[in-house]
Amino acid sequence: MIGSLTVLPAVLSKLGDRVEKGRIPLLGRFRRPAGEGRIWGKVLNPVLRRPALSASLATALLVALAIPTLQIHTASSSLTTMPRSIPTVETLDRLQAAFPGKPGPAVIAVNTNTTSTAFRTAVAELQVAASATHRGYGAISVDSNQSHTVGRITIPLPGNGTDGTSTRALLTLRGQLLPATIGKLPGVTYGVTGATANSFDWNEMMKSSLPIVFAFVLTFGFLLLLASFRSLVIAAKAVILNLLSVAAAYGVVVAVFQFGWGQNVLNFTSNGAVAPWLPLFLFVILFGLSMDYHVFILSRVREAYDRGMSTEDAVAHGIRTTAGTVTSAALVMVGVFSIFATLPILDMKEMGIGLAAAVLIDATIVRAVLLPATMKLLGDWN
């Protein structure tokens, strides 16, 4: 923004008429004057003729895309999500098949005398209690430091390390098995780590941050729009439309990656979850992009309305005159974000598809249909 307001004007002023040099002659024939967007005009005319129907259909489509979000599950990805043709992944599959739980066991660090009879008894009780749960825990192994003051207990967990089976086994270990065995040792302190524990704890930390970030971003965006346009309706509607865009993008990501609908096309193995950091990342980035489009379009609509146009004419003028810019920017971003879907890393695929889908949805369904339809319906309330 600083560069656009300072460096860009200075450079353009310095260049003067020379900025026109280097134009490609043939491309000038395809340019159309502002306000003559025929494609968006064909879309916009029926929307403004039947705003209630258009708004209903657009909302229904966004809600349908967002429905998978209700089943969103987050977990860290691992080598198992990468293409099976990679030698490392093949080796990991063989290890997991031959030694279930060994590639990603739970590791318990225990601060106690590891040579004591009480400690050895507690470890034996832990093994018996783990076997009694019938959850598929593996055989326990124990080692300690040279001074025998800190022990390390390794116990293989069932599942692939990030699925529900592994998570439930981890919670049982932390909440029931360890307190009933190791936790009874006098003066003992212990903690559970390992790949599954790291993934679970990171996931829980991200979940706890979501409400705070959501509340701050929504409130901040609402207040900025309220200050800019002096309208509660415009500010509230912008927040709602942006939330619909984000929810629809979440739904696409969940369907493609968590449900595994895109496995064959994008060449990955679903772990039944999406990356823990992705919901927060997508929300912040997409809300900013959506708000940018929204303010850009509304500014043109307001300018037209202030010049004496009716609400319907101002909306049509604002959409048509900004459609080319919004569409071009959206296509560039969709193309750039889609590149991430070609990478072998699952998190990058999720980010690319999520961003590309959200920008495409926002620039078409939301800005070209839902926004003008709701503005026409609200009339002077805008």
Named regions from a protein language model:
Residues M1-T74, G187-V188, A195-N382:
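Membrane-embedded transmembrane helical bundles of large multi-pass transporters/channels
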Residues Q71-Q263, V295, D347:
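Structured non-transmembrane domains adjacent to transmembrane bundles in polytopic membrane proteins
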